[in-house]
């Protein structure tokens, strides 16, 4: 079988190649679900799992095997260190695959000669707790869950910056509109964070 993120990326690359030569601008959203549970080695390509199969991952500095008293039952810590290690191996295997797929898509954009005309965003909706604060999964405002990467690239138009600031997914649409010199409609949640 084909790993879903690989297939999605292939479809996105095909879309880019088909639309790259058109006059009209296009918009593409690629929503890859990984890294995400189930944390089983049959849920990631073997070559990526093999990269991490013997890697020990230390617990987070704020790891606790005491359950968060305010956490939902489904987010309680798994009190099995070996299982937690295996889940982390699979998480990093999936992350490595995601990195490869994002790299393929960016290369496709460049190969089609539209990199300087393309605003590229990479982000995530949440992180993963893996025992930090005695929790698993997401749905908390702890840093491990709430702090996610946000990369925005537009060669020649947006200068390279490394910012440490709070923003939300609702800021993406107004920021894209701002970069495109399109007025943000009144009542839209979020802020235009374009430079």
Which residue stretches match the model-derived regions?
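Active-site-proximal cap/lid insertion segments
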Residues: 1-9, 13-170, 178-187
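Short, intrinsically disordered, charge-balanced linker/junction segments flanking boundaries
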Residues: 186-195
């Amino acid at each position: 079988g084909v790993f879903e993120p690989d297939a999605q990326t292939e479809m996105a690359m095909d879309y880019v190649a088909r639309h790259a030569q058109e006059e009209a601008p296009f918009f593409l959203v690629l929503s890859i679900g990984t890294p995400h549970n189930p944390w089983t080695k049959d849920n990631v390509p073997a070559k990526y799992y093999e990269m991490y199969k013997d890697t020990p991952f230390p617990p987070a500095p704020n790891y606790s095997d005491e359950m968060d008293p305010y956490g939902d039952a489904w987010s309680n810590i798994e009190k099995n260190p070996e299982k937690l290690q295996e889940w982390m191996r699979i998480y990093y295997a999936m992350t490595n695959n995601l990195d490869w797929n994002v790299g393929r898509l960016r290369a496709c954009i460049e190969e089609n000669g539209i990199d300087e005309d393309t605003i590229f965003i990479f982000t995530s909706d949440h992180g993963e707790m893996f025992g930090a604060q005695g929790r698993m999964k997401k749905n908390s405002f702890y840093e491990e869950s709430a702090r996610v990467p946000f990369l925005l690239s537009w060669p020649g138009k947006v200068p390279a910056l490394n910012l440490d600031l709070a923003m939300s997914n609702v800021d993406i649409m107004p920021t894209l509109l701002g970069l495109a010199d399109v007025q943000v409609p009144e009542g839209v949640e979020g802020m235009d964070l374009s430079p």
